[in-house]
Amino acid sequence: MNTVYVVGTCDTKGGELRYLRDLIRQAGCDAVLVDVSVSEFHSQAADVDVQPSEVARFHPNPPKPEDLKDRGKAVAAMAQALVEFIRSRPDVDGIIGAGGTGGTALIAPALRALPIGTPKVLVSTVASGNVAPYVGPTDISMMYSVTDVSGLNRISRVVLANAAHSVAGMVLNKVSAAKDERPAIGLTMFGVTTPCVQAVTRALEADFDCLVFHATGTGGQSFEKLADSALLVGGIDVSTTEVCDYLVGGVFPCTADRFGAFARTRLPYVGSCGALDMVNFGAMDTVPSRFRSRRLHVHNPQVTLMRTTPEECNRIGEWIAERLNLCEGTVRFLIPELGVSAIDAPGQPFHDPEADSALFAALERTLRRTTKRQLIRVPLHINDPQFAELLVTNFKEALREH
C-alpha cells in the first residue's frame, strides 16, 4: 500500500494532524504520523507512529540538552534530525505537514530533501506570503491555512481535508516519468530572452530533453540542483540575470553558489549575458526608495525592472567571470554585443551601450581564458537567430570535448 507521512508537532497540532492522517487512510493510503514536537513537557501519545525522541536520534551531531531549552535552537535541531530521518525511510510515497511559522520552518527542509516528483504538501499560515525560503528549488505544494492551524473548525476542516485529499490523490495517481532515451540538458530563460531560448530548444530537442528554467532565483537553483544530481549532461545558461538581483538587491536573486554546480561537476557549460541589463522588483510601489530615481520600466503590473548602471555592470561582469574561473570543465561564454535582452536594443527602454560595454569589458578583463574556458564576442543581439545558432554550435562542441 502507498504510504504518506504526516508530519507536525502533536503537542500543539495533534488534532489537526490526526484529522489529516485519518482522511488519508480513508482515501486508500497508509499514513504514518510523525511527531516532531520540541516541548520538554510534551508527553508521548500512544497513537503516534514515530515519537519525537526517535526522530531526534537521527541528528548527525546531537546538541547538548541545555541548548534544547532555547526553542529556536530546539526547532533547528529537530529540523536537521527530521531531514535525516525522512531520508532514511524507504517507504515515503508522499508527505504532508501542517504548522505555523515554527512548524513550517521545521518541516520544510525535510520536504526539500525528497526527490523531485515525490508528492509533498505543506499547509501553513505563511503560505500566502513569500514562500521561496520554504520551497527552494523543489516541488513542494504549499497551501494557505486561512485560519491558524489551531483547532478544527468549519474553515480548517475544509482546508485540511483538501490538503489530505490532494496528497492522497497525487500518491494514488502517480505518473511515472516518461521513458526518454534523450539525455537532458538545462537552459535558463527570462521573458526578454525567450526568442533565443526557444530557438535553441527547437534546434536541440530532437536529440536532447530540453529542460527550461525560469531565471527567478529559485529557477537557477533548480537548474543547478539537477546538474549537481547528475540529471543533466550539460547546461546552456542563456539568462544569468539572477546575478543582477543578487549583487544590486532585486527580488529574483541567485545565491553565492551560482555556477557552483558546474565547477563541482565539470559538466559542459555554455552561458551568456541574458537580461544582465535589469534588476527585478515587484509592483512599482514596492521599488525601494533609493532606486526610485533610476531608469525603471513596468514589465507588467506585478514586475518593475530597473536598468543596471555601468558601475553595476562592471561588478556583475567581474563576479560572473570570477565564478566561471572556478570551472575546470569546458566553458564557453558568449557575449552578444548588440544587446542582452529584448529591451536592450535601439529604441528600447534599456538600450545603454555604455553599460553594456562596462559589462563586456569586465568579463574580458576578469575571465582567465584557457583552451577549455573561452569568451566569445559576436556582433549580434541575444535574440538574433544567428546567436541561438552559435549557442547550439558551441554546446555541441563542448559536449564533444567533455
From Swiss-Prot:
Listed transmembrane segments: none
Pfam families: UPF0261, UPF0261_C
Keywords noted in UniProt: Plasmid
Tagged with keyword Signal: no
The keyword Oxidoreductase appears for this protein: no
Protein family according to the UniProt entry: Belongs to the UPF0261 family.
PANTHER family referenced in this protein's UniProt entry, alphabetically: UPF0261 DOMAIN PROTEIN (AFU_ORTHOLOGUE AFUA_1G10120)
NCBIfam families found in the cross-reference section: PRK02399.1-1 (NF002673), PRK02399.1-2 (NF002674)
Name of the protein this chain belongs to: UPF0261 protein y4oU
Species this chain originates from: Sinorhizobium fredii (strain NBRC 101917 / NGR234)
